[in-house]
């Protein structure tokens, strides 16, 4: 393939761009909404963390999900992840999740256990019903001491459902 001078420059710029990935876990879809908005505004690739045993996404069964989440937390379980996610090809990884029992779901621990984030930039975001980030951003810093963890974005569940575009835009500008 033959490239002209300007095309060569464009290809070189693309090669030098930091590759970004948005990874998220979402049962009710609110973290997914925020993840999709981040991917849209950054041009990042996007991947869902899929549980090997799917969680019940029927909101009428919230209490059952809450009990299961508490049991997983109390027993320090690591739920299996169904899909493989290529984090090695990315420099910057946005990681999103809902808050369960004032922390992230145990499957997020599985995700951090499974992959090496050394030398990468991690940018967390989460959805919640009033607990903010619950200290999870500091937990990520402890779990991944060889990664650079930037300021995260906590989004209230109703704000995610009503459209997080402005909050995401403001947050992304603060990171740059």
Segments (PLM) and residue ranges:
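N-terminal beta1-alpha1-beta2 submodule of the flavodoxin-like/Rossmannoid cofactor-binding fold
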Residues: 2-95, 102-104, 109, 113, ...
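Structural beta-sheet core signal
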Residues: 22, 95, 124-126, 151
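Short, charged, surface-exposed secondary-structure boundary motifs
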Residues: 55-59, 134, 159-162
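Short, conserved loop/helix-junction motifs that constitute active-site signature segments
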Residues: 87, 113-119, 142-144
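Loop/turn elements at helix/coil->beta-strand transitions in domains of secreted/extracellular proteins
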Residues: 90-92, 119-120, 147-148
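Short beta-alpha junction loops
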Residues: 126-131, 157
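Glycine-rich, charge-decorated loop segments at or immediately adjacent to ligand/cofactor-binding or catalytic sites
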Residues: 130-143
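Glycine-rich phosphate/pyrophosphate-binding loop and the adjoining helix
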Residues: 148-176
